[in-house]
Every structure is written in C-alpha cells, then in structure tokens.
C-alpha cells in the first residue's frame, strides 16, 4: 500500500504541464503575426496622403503603392477593400468617384486636422498631477484638528465662571448680614418719634376749660 500511494499523484503532473506549453506557443505565434507589419488602414492612409492627384487615388493606383511598400496585394485584396470602406465610414478618406471599394479616394483634410489636434491633448494628459493637489487637501484636515485644541480650552473658560459664581455667592451673604443690623436700629427711632406726637392731645384739654370761666364774669 505504501508503494502505490506516491505513484498516483505523480501521474497527473505531466498532463498539467502540456497545456501550458501549448498556450505559450500560441501566444508567441500571435505576437509574430502582429509584429509582421502595420495594419492595412495605416498603409492605405499613407499611400493616399503621399499621392499628389487632386481628383484622388484610384483603387488600381492604391494597390500599386501598397505593392511597392512590400504589401502582398493579391492575398490581402479583400482586406484592402474592407480597409477602404472602414476609412470612408470613419471620415478619414473621402470617396470622390465610384461606389464601395471601387473608385478614387482622397484624404479628408478635416479628419487629418482632427487627428493632429489630439496630440496636444496628450500633453494635457499630464494633468493627472492634480491628484498631488488632492494630497494637499489632507493638510486642511490637520487644520481641522485645531478646533480640537479650542475645544480643550473651552472647559477652562467654563470653570472660571463657576468659580466666579462661587465667589459671588460667598459675597452675597455678607451683604445680607450688613443690611439686617442697619434696619434694626431705625425701627426704635421711629417708635420714639411717635410717642411725643401722642402727647399733644393732652395740651388740648385745657382749652376746653375756658368756657367755664365765662359764666363767672356774668355774675
């Protein structure tokens, strides 16, 4: 049993390695095909731009220019026609004569000018430096930490009014004690002033005795 157990995992190992090699070969072959030359659309645009004919380049003249550049025209005849149609639909080429792939073609100046303008836009692609400015924003967050210091200072201010309130409360009973003895001596003084006023009616009694003397004079 111990001899058969290690033999089982050893068998699937070569089966796993084989598809990896096939994928590597396929990717290498695809890379070689792509690196063989530029696409047909680029060759067509270069050939049309190089021609000096005002009426445009005919399909026959275009094939001659591509053959002179080393492009196999006979094998890629269908690709040339498809490339012409796609360039006309995009607006890079203008068909001056004929319909479809047959006829004469001319480079669209507006499209060429539009292709030249995107180059400065690439320079504007360097604008992602603004994220560095976004990194500066966290510095403002450090400034937001300053209110925390102010929040720590506020409790100190709250303690001061509490101490002042305690001092005022301590002072207020002193005023109350000083006010009570002042009112007490005033009350007996008023009472003394009232007693002599009550003695005045006693002086009025002798005035009533004057009429008694009048009948004595008649005698």
From Swiss-Prot:
InterPro entries: H1/H5, Histone_H1/H5_H15, WH-like_DNA-bd_sf, WH_DNA-bd_sf. This is Histone H1.4. Residues 1-41, 91-219 are annotated as: Disordered. Keywords: Acetylation, Chromosome, Citrullination, DNA-binding, Hydroxylation, Methylation, Nucleus, Phosphoprotein. The modification Phosphoserine is found at residues 2, 36, 187. The keyword Nucleus applies. The keyword Acetylation applies. One of its GO terms (molecular function) is structural constituent of chromatin. The modification Phosphothreonine is found at residues 18, 146. It comes from Oryctolagus cuniculus (Rabbit). Gene3D superfamilies: Winged helix-like DNA-binding domain superfamily/Winged helix DNA-binding domain. PROSITE patterns: H15.
């Amino acid at each position: 049993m111990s001899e058969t157990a290690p033999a089982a995992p050893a068998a699937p190992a070569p089966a796993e390695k084989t598809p990896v090699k096939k994928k590597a070969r396929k990717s290498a072959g695809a890379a070689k095909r792509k690196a063989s030359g530029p696409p047909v659309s680029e060759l067509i645009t270069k050939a049309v731009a190089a021609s000096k004919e005002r009426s445009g380049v005919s399909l026959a003249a275009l094939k001659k220019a591509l053959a002179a550049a080393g492009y196999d025209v006979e094998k890629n005849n269908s690709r040339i026609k498809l490339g012409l149609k796609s360039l006309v639909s995009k607006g890079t080429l203008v068909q001056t004569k004929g319909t479809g792939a047959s006829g004469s073609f001319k480079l669209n100046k507006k499209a060429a000018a539009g292709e030249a303008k995107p180059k400065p836009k690439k320079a504007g692609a360097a604008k992602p430096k603004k994220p560095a400015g976004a990194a500066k924003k966290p510095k403002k967050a450090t400034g937001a930490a300053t209110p925390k210091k102010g929040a720590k200072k506020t409790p100190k201010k709250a303690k001061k009014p509490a101490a002042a309130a305690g001092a005022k409360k301590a002072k207020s009973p002193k005023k109350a004690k000083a006010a009570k003895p002042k009112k007490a001596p005033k009350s007996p003084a008023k009472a003394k002033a009232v007693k002599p006023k009550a003695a005045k009616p006693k002086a009025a009694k002798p005035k009533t005795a004057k009429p008694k003397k009048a009948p004595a004079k008649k005698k």
